[in-house]
UniProtKB/Swiss-Prot annotation:
This is Cytochrome b6-f complex subunit 4. The 4 large subunits of the cytochrome b6-f complex are cytochrome b6, subunit IV (17 kDa polypeptide, PetD), cytochrome f and the Rieske protein, while the 4 small subunits are PetG, PetL, PetM and PetN. The complex functions as a dimer. Signal peptide: none annotated. Gene3D superfamilies: plastocyanin oxidoreductase (1.10.287.980), Single helix bin (1.20.5.510). It comes from Crocosphaera subtropica (strain ATCC 51142 / BH68). Pfam families: Cytochrom_B_C. The keyword Transport applies. Disulfide bonds: none annotated. It is found in: Cellular thylakoid membrane. One of its GO terms (biological process) is photosynthetic electron transport chain. One of its GO terms (cellular component) is plasma membrane-derived thylakoid membrane. The lineage of its organism: Bacteria, Bacillati, Cyanobacteriota, Cyanophyceae, Oscillatoriophycideae. The chain crosses the membrane at residues 36-56, 95-115, 131-151. It comes from the Bacteria.
Length: 160
């Protein structure tokens, strides 16, 4: 049961505050304890109940069931490791592949020092950081997509 206090619009103090831009909901219902103790748990438990119900009624399969008697031609890692796997697979020297994996975070650490003159947060006013981000995103998607192809088609993604 919510207790609502109606504003007295004839009060000169309230009219002065409203004239200065104070919101109309000044006399509204407080968030503590009403929302935090009653509304939020209902929403959280309802969401959990909905997710559990969907998982029980319609379970999603995670890939094909394992068959111990059929080995795939090429064993692939999880999807989020495809770019790393592709770098190690394409480069001829494995030490070079590991060095490339270490060079990626080191290169990202250098970006703030390269662009230290620029103090803006807007990406359109930070061309070096934006270019590094876009280049890294495109290369990561390209490597991740190429990891699913055979080794001879992996760099061209089977297009050429």
């Amino acid at each position: 049961m919510a207790i609502e206090k109606k504003p007295d619009l004839s009060d000169p103090k309230l009219r002065a505050k409203l004239a200065q831009g104070m919101g109309h909901n000044y006399y509204g219902e407080p968030a503590w304890p009403n929302d935090l103790l009653y509304v939020f748990p209902v929403v959280i438990l309802g969401t959990i109940g909905l997710l559990v119900g969907l998982a029980v009624l319609d379970p999603a399969l995670i890939g094909e069931p394992a068959d111990p008697f059929a080995t795939p031609l090429e064993i692939l890692p999880e999807w989020y490791l495809y770019p790393v796997f592709q770098i190690l697979r394409v480069l001829p020297n494995k030490l070079l592949g590991i060095a490339c994996q270490g060079a990626i975070p080191l290169g990202l650490l250098l970006v703030p020092f390269i662009e230290s003159v620029n103090k803006f947060q807007n990406p359109f006013r930070r061309p070096i950081a934006t270019a590094v981000f876009l280049f890294g995103t495109v290369v990561t998607i390209w490597l991740g997509a190429g990891a699913t192809f055979p080794i001879d088609e992996s760099l061209t993604l089977g297009l050429f």
